[in-house]
Amino acid sequence: MFSFNKSEHLCGETQINRLFAEGKAFIVYPVRVVYMFKSEDIPTIKVLVSVPKKKFKRAVARNRLKRLMRESYRLNKTSLLAFCSEKQLSLQIAFCYVGNESADFQTIESKIKIALEKIIQAESK
């Protein structure tokens, strides 16, 4: 339940390009969220985490932010999993860090929680 396996990672250039071209987006600063629902028999959630090299030159800083975003998603994904399995939907999400400064875990976790709730509310309508 609290795992984040390779099968949950969004991979493949075509899938990523389609997500950014056709997906809906919003910002919960410092995270930009792009998501796209598809109706499928087997509901799955695929996640992409991104931190720009332009703003964070050092790989250590980028990797830390990606690790924090992955961890906060992993801990708070249960409501999203329940929603997708109930509605028989597949979901692709991209979390892109847009802040200029590095944030702590509490900040990122609260913003990811808000983002996941927004995704559920948007599709519930």
List PLM regions with ranges.
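Positively charged, solvent-exposed patches that mediate nucleic-acid binding
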Residues: 1-125
